[in-house]
């Protein structure tokens, strides 16, 4: 009776230690935040970064339909504005060696929920059958009156992608 009891205690201690080590390694991120500006002049003028990566998490500010000078594009056309937002988000994800497959939260703000619901199926092409969590929020207005939609993302990059990005010159076999 004493031997099975000791074996059980040993297994419990070892498994707790492994769980603790894994939790500690996930919380031990020693990298500094990496800031990314998609349109540096615009973002500096308004005082924000379009994206910030800390360890394996990326927070992406709301994308709106604008040109490189910060002027609204596709004015009055919510569907095209949405496509422009996703195009900008794709550029940001690519910068971080990531994709829409890594998106875990997507929040959409729109001034015309009815029209958005008509064109929301475009997202099927982006996410396939792996949709992120998130919210669709109808708002009175966005930063400029011409903006009809704004999309913000949170991304989780796998450890494998992080290692490839952080050590591109090393062989990852």
Placement of each model-derived feature along the sequence:
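N-terminal presequence-like segments and the immediate start of the first folded domain
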Residues: 16-87, 91-96, 101, 110-173
């Amino acid at each position: 009776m004493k031997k099975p009891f000791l074996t059980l205690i040993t297994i419990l201690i070892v498994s707790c230690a492994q769980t603790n080590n894994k939790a500690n390694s996930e919380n031990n991120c020693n990298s500094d935040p990496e800031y990314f500006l998609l349109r540096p002049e615009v973002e500096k003028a308004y005082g924000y970064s379009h994206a910030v990566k800390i360890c394996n998490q990326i927070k992406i500010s709301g994308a709106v339909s604008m040109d490189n000078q910060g002027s609204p594009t596709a004015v009055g056309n919510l569907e095209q504005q949405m496509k422009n937002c996703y195009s900008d988000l794709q550029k940001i994800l690519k910068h971080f060696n990531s994709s829409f497959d890594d998106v875990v939260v997507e929040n959409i703000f729109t001034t015309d929920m009815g029209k958005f619901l008509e064109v929301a199926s475009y997202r099927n092409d982006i996410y396939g059958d792996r949709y992120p969590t998130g919210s669709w929020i109808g708002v009175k207005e966005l930063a400029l009156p011409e903006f009809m939609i704004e999309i913000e993302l949170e991304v989780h990059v796998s450890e494998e992608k992080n290692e490839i990005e952080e050590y591109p010159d090393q062989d990852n076999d």
